Amino acid sequence: PASWPAREIVDQVSLQRSRAPRAAGAPGAPATDGAAGAAGHIHFSLSTLAQDRAGLATLLQMGPYARPALVPAMPWLGDTPPAGPTLRRRVGGLRIEGPATAARWAVWRRIGGTWRFDVQPAQDRDLDTAGASAVAVATVDRTGKLSEVQLLHLP
């Protein structure tokens, strides 16, 4: 065809994400990590997205890009994972303490029996725990490597 249908591209992105390996110890991750799978995807042409051809950008924003995601790790820039965070209880939530090398935090909150994922900048160290029965946090360094996940069950 002259161009791929937008729905085909969205379905391919969703399929790639469903096969991506998860961080060891992350909520919902298998007991063993490192299974083969895609860690990300690349779009051939940014102009297609910028011009929203065939509504592709809109479909991606409403579908697989509606939720936060981490940039795939770049292990060729070093394979030592960052130190993990420490979670401290405070009024209204938690305080994340971690290494100066942190670029962001990978945050999972268990709300109503479902794990919800978010990404926070490293300078944002306060974590709202309203409605959460558990929280898990990992340090993410500038090359996308994750630390071990710190899990805290909340009362």
Regions found by a protein language model. Give the residues of each.
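Substrate-binding cleft of secreted/luminal carbohydrate-active enzymes
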Residues: 1-74
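Flexible, glycine-rich phosphate/dinucleotide-binding loops
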Residues: 50, 114, 146
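Pro/Thr/Ser/Gly-rich low-complexity, intrinsically disordered linker/stalk tracts
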Residues: 65-101, 144-155
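Short beta-strand segments within Ig-like beta-sandwich modules, predominantly Fibronectin type-III
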Residues: 116-123
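Beta-strand-rich modules
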Residues: 127-146
